[in-house]
Amino acid sequence: MLFLGMANAYVMRTNMSVAIVAMVNHTAIKSGEEEYDDECGDRDIPIDDSQDGEFPWNAALQGYILSSFFYGYVITQIPFGILAKKYGSLRFLGYGMLINSVFAFLVPVAAREGGVWGLCAVRFIQGLGEGPIVPCTHAMLAKWIPPNERSRMGAAVYAGAQFGTIISMPLSGLLAEYGFDGGWPSIFYVFGIVGTVWSIAFLIFVYEDPSTHPKIDEREKKYINESLWGTDVIKSPPIPFKSIVKSLPFYAILFAHMGHNYGYETLMTELPTYMKQVLRFSLKSNGLLSSLPYLAMWLLSMFISVIADWMISSKRFSLTATRKIINSIGQYGPGLALIAASYTGCDRALTLAILTIGVGLNGGIYSGFKINHLDLTPRFAGFLMSITNCSANLAGLLAPIAAGNLISDPSKPVMGQWQIVFFIAAFVYIICGTFYNIFGSGERQFWDNPSEDEQKPALESSSTTNPPRLSNGSSAPRAISSS
């Protein structure tokens, strides 16, 4: 259910990136296409002007529309991280996604009746609703997943982000071209229905932690709790704010997260525009081909997570070394790919191949910094994620604004403007990944263990304890859902 929830969340984030290509009347604004034709010559597949939309929004306005979701998204990160620690995560996550899904139905009327700023307001509210998804998911993972399974299970859940993108982009392209009510509005109606159904199912069938699940086997419950918390009763101490603020491993995660989000949001929000404006793919092809990098990321994230867990369980690498090696793949890979793609010019196949490989390697972050919060502090993982995710999305919301302003000048060559966009994203990826390699850690921090009985890292105790075999022959843990 958490995998599907992450998928729904990213559907809501990414569908506007494809929809806006169909919404905007490209012949009514200057996009610099004439200069692009001079650079690359005539393309074999020209843009079909009949696909132009109803709104004369330039690149800068499109950047504000694409970023408006993230303004709402970042506001709710830290508050929900604190609330989830105190009251539990399940209700905040479920009702937040329900708000996000219901407001998706209002996107078409907001755009047509309220213009740019009406649309921005609705997308802002959607962002508010989606705010709990990551900190609350992290908090629930901390309660359900033993330390020696975090790479694999964490990657499996967060790979829902790529799965949602894979579904959203091609389906949004098809709905924009063949859907009802002018095409693009059907994107928000269809995904609004899907998100609403998931939210209701999540609130009915999912439980906060093993202790509240009515059907979980007692041995399984004991195994999960002891592998996470030792033999002590699970406690809820106050958040150690001062220790967190002084923690270099925390800042390593913070900067890695910020660098990732800036680069990732640059690609996620701007790739469909790049595919249309520079690579000149049709609307239908745009959505399908824009999803290929995220298909690669989904598949590679799962493969890399298995390698990461093997590195840890085989004891060939320390937890710290594993996180840094895998995270380097996840951040240096896309950074170098963006640099390479900026020099491929008009070669559509080569550009798409490089971006697909680069974004695919980005899947390493799910077994790198993205799951590292749980290593440092199982007790406060959700709160830490709320801080880093809030900061990361503040960085991420700058990406479409920066890109929109950089590519909005029709007097400059389009390829040159996009090269700057790619260079900036690559630089941020590499610098932040390097900071993580210098200061990151996989060790459980002292401020997560308030009692002397729990000074021993949970990873050590869990790695020497075999999971109980259940009556059906499977090993713990099972799914969070009761279904």
Curated annotation (Swiss-Prot):
GO cellular component, one term: membrane
GO MF annotations, alphabetized: phosphate transmembrane transporter activity; symporter activity
Pfam family membership, one: MFS_1
Source species, domain of life: Eukaryota
InterPro entries given in the database record: MFS, MFS_dom, MFS_Na/Anion_cotransporter, MFS_trans_sf, Pi_cotranspt
GO terms of biological process kind: monoatomic anion transport; phosphate ion transmembrane transport; sodium ion transport
Gene3D superfamilies: MFS general substrate transporter like domains (1.20.1250.20)
UniProt keyword list: Ion transport, Membrane, Sodium, Sodium transport, Symport, Transmembrane, Transmembrane helix, Transport
Compartments reported by the entry: Membrane
Function: May be an inorganic phosphate cotransporter.
Family of this protein: Belongs to the major facilitator superfamily. Sodium/anion cotransporter family.
PANTHER family assigned to the protein according to its UniProt record, in alphabetical order: MAJOR FACILITATOR SUPERFAMILY (MFS) PROFILE DOMAIN-CONTAINING PROTEIN-RELATED, SOLUTE CARRIER FAMILY 17
UniProt-recorded name of the protein: Putative inorganic phosphate cotransporter
Protein species of origin: Drosophila ananassae
Phylogenetic classification of the source organism: Eukaryota, Metazoa, Ecdysozoa, Arthropoda, Hexapoda
